[in-house]
């Protein structure tokens, strides 16, 4: 199997999640500058309106995680007040608009996934630490225990990177 001409095995071995995401979205692997910009843009958008927590806690802890995640993802649009553009009428703004939406999703979905997991397990909710790598942050948000120093597990980070 191949993604945009690259074998999945090569990508799993030599690229991280954000590089593969960039490849799938834009059709080519990112340059260092493109990847650095993507990472910085994700970090800048890694805040979720606190009112989304109210929606999350309204679900029973026993509710299916995918149903909760789907609902929270749908609710993000209510907290995204920027101008909407028509993607059927070409205005020249489509690329920037789509890039910004993609960045927002890449920034917010890991937080929502971690929140759903942590809520289901009775743990406090966290925004994570985006000074770490993307996948490292996801695993920390999910598995860090309150009042304990988080120790990164490279096996879990590597497995998560390949799964994503």
Tell me what each language-model feature is.
Residues 1-164:
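Hydrophobic alpha-helical bundle cores within soluble ligand-binding/oligomerization subdomains
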């Amino acid at each position: 199997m191949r993604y945009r001409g690259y074998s999945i095995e090569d990508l799993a071995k030599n690229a991280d999640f954000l590089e593969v995401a960039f490849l799938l979205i834009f059709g080519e692997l990112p340059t260092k500058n493109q990847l650095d910009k993507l990472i910085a843009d994700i970090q800048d958008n890694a805040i979720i309106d606190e009112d989304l927590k109210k929606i999350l806690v309204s679900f029973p802890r026993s509710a299916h995680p995918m149903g909760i995640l789907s609902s929270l993802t749908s609710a993000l649009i209510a907290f995204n007040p920027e101008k909407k553009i028509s993607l059927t009428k070409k205005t020249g703004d489509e690329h920037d608009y789509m890039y910004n939406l993609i960045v927002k999703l890449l920034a917010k979905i890991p937080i929502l996934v971690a929140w759903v997991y942590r809520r289901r397990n009775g743990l406090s909710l966290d925004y994570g630490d985006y000074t770490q790598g993307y996948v490292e942050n996801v695993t920390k948000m999910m598995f860090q225990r309150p009042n304990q120093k988080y120790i990164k597990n490279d096996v879990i980070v590597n497995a998560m990177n390949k799964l994503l």
